[in-house]
Every structure is written in C-alpha cells, then in structure tokens.
Amino acid sequence: MSLGISISNSIKGFRSSGGGAVDADAQAFITAASITDPTQQSAINQLVVDLKGYSIWSKMKAIYPFVGGTASAHKFNLKDPQDTDAAFRLVFNGGWTHSSTGATPNGTNGWADTFVKTGTDLALNSTHVSV
C-alpha cells in the first residue's frame, strides 16, 4: 500500500494590503529561492508579515511555501532560507515533479528530508506538524 501525497501551494491567492518595505525575512527567502514574480514576492511578504502580526512566526521552526516551480526553489525554509541541513532545507529523494503549483512525489520512492530532529529540534508534548 502506498500513500500518495501532493504538496501544493495557494500563495498566488494572497493579496497584499498595501505598499511599504519588504520584511527582511521575506526578502531573504525571496532572494534564496530566486523568486522573481512580483505577485509571489508580495504574497510571501504578506504571509511573513501576517504570521508575525498574529504572533505565529516565532512558534514555527520551518515553513515551506513551495513557490518558484523548481526543486531548487522549493527546498528553502521560509524561516531560515540557508542551503544547509541546520536551516531545515529540504532534500528531495526519489522521484518528484516540481511545478508552479507545488511538488508531487511519484508515489513509489519520493520523499523529502527536512533535517528536523524530533528529539532535539521539537519540544516534547508541544509540537504540531502540517502537510
């Protein structure tokens, strides 16, 4: 039995609430993932601003927006967009299809390593994981 999982994004549905400077964390991700589309840049910025505004940002270890359409863009953690295991970047293994709407494993051997260690990176009895 295999479990099919498709990881998609709906970031293009977000709308910016107005002008202003781009948040430094959003800009770091935009730069690392080479996001050039202004709508996606605005949506990423708004996502970061909103997560911070609702005091959710500091509670998260990793966020993977799956924007940019390639494995090279999809691998970056919005919280720490460095290309290192310690920054919880994704390493895709097996077969994957990457597109502007997200990433889909092949259903046979596709998986991604987050490098998040449950015993050291996550708090006991205070953890939530979403896919």
Describe each model-derived feature in a short phrase.
Residues 2-129:
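Extracytoplasmic low-complexity segments
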